[in-house]
Amino acid sequence: MTKKRHLFTSESVTEGHPDKICDQISDSILDAILSKDANARVACETTVTTGLVLVAGEITTSTYVDIPKIVRETIQGIGYTRAKYGFDAETCAVLTSIDEQSADIAMGVDQALEAREGQMTDAEIEAIGAGDQGLMFGFACNETQELMPLPISLAHKLARRLTEVRKNDTLSYLRPDGKTQVTVEYDENGKPVRVDTIVISTQHHPDVTWEEIDRDLKEHVIKAVVPAELIDGETKFFINPTGRFVIGGPQGDAGLTGRKIIVDTYGGYARHGGGAFSGKDATKVDRSAAYAARYVAKNIVAAGLAEKAEVQLAYAIGVAQPVSISVDTFGTGKVSEDVLVELVRNNFDLRPAGIIKMLDLRRPIYKQTAAYGHFGRTDVDLTWERTDKAAALKEQAGL
């Protein structure tokens, strides 16, 4: 079947978006706990609305952290520092409702089913059972240097740049809430050739004009991020298309942890298992196995075994070994997908304990992932973004 030129769109949001505030609070609490108790079990959910933060969840730990203090410091760091923003780090109410992890769940995580039934060797007995059932996807493609789809890559860079020009006072009239969206045109061979549409909505001071915002964002945000060769005379720009965005953040919309799972991953370009990341320690396969799946997919593409690769992992609660591993290369693979699955099994320990060890996940590294994407990051060193398995995969594949 002949391929046609087509458009694909992805979005991102700034760290001041209500849902992203929640993700950052949840991961800040997780990091604070892990910095004192690496083996803590954390499932921390946050909701924000006008003048209020609620933190709830299940946390089992030997340490103490000051949750209201962490919440206020996180909000202050994002930039909600004045009451007239409708949400302020100093004056917002902070409510907490924290329980311990269910003993029924802990029983499966503490000792994997294989260990309880005597199926594992002594060396494997410490393997952790999956904290839940579920399916997770990882993806990589050769559209960008970081092996991510171009639409989400550009959307994240625009969102990050929006925050940079606000915080460094290049555009001091900007406020923390904002969203970006990028539509990329692909040619008949599935290669990105141009940017068709850019949408940016940003919260701002009430006295600034739309014309000023339009001019400044094109000059200081879009030009600074999007390669000039991708923009042409047909590219469309929608800057604050409603004309005004003064009321924003939690005053404009309530926020919840885990409501930006497509922004967090591949911008809709790859499939998603449905599980969110933020506020969860690494025994939760929603997070750790999604990171592992990205690690696998990225190394497959970096090894030249495929131009794009999507990896699916699936787990049963309390069972260490994944119940399934599959790889889809969308017809771009240099070897069969059966061979790729075998290579994955031979080179990656995809039991929860194996993932935690392989990617060193018991560290306080998570707040930095809670805005601008968990994958394709070039500004921070994330273990699942490394391509240290690529050479071995290539050699074992006989390429």
Swiss-Prot record:
Binding note for cofactor: Binds 2 divalent ions per subunit. Binds 1 potassium ion per subunit.
Pathway the protein acts in: Amino-acid biosynthesis; S-adenosyl-L-methionine biosynthesis; S-adenosyl-L-methionine from L-methionine: step 1/1
Residues at which K(+) binds: E45
Gene3D superfamilies: 3.30.300.10
Cofactor: Mg(2+); K(+)
Residue ranges of the region described as Flexible loop: 101-111
UniProt-listed Enzyme Commission number(s): 2.5.1.6
Any Gene Ontology biological process: one-carbon metabolic process
Gene Ontology terms for molecular function: ATP binding; magnesium ion binding; methionine adenosyltransferase activity
InterPro entries: ADOMET_SYNTHASE_CS, S-AdoMet_synt_C, S-AdoMet_synt_central, S-AdoMet_synt_N, S-AdoMet_synthetase, S-AdoMet_synthetase_sfam
Secretion signal, residue range per the UniProt entry: none
Record's catalysed reaction(s): L-methionine + ATP + H2O = S-adenosyl-L-methionine + phosphate + diphosphate
GO CC annotation terms, alphabetical: cytoplasm
UniProt: ATP binding residues: H17, D177, G178, K179, R244, F245, D253, R259, K260, A276, K280
Coiled-coil zones: none
Binding site for Mg(2+): D19
Keywords assigned by UniProt, alphabetized: ATP-binding, Cytoplasm, Magnesium, Metal-binding, Nucleotide-binding, One-carbon metabolism, Potassium, Transferase
Main location: cytoplasm
A Pfam family it matches: S-AdoMet_synt_M
Binding site for L-methionine: E58, Q101, D253, K284
Cellular location(s): Cytoplasm
Family indicated by similarity: Belongs to the AdoMet synthase family.
Functional description taken from the UniProt entry: Catalyzes the formation of S-adenosylmethionine (AdoMet) from methionine and ATP. The overall synthetic reaction is composed of two sequential steps, AdoMet formation and the subsequent tripolyphosphate hydrolysis which occurs prior to release of AdoMet from the enzyme.
Complexes and interactors: Homotetramer; dimer of dimers.
Protein name: S-adenosylmethionine synthase
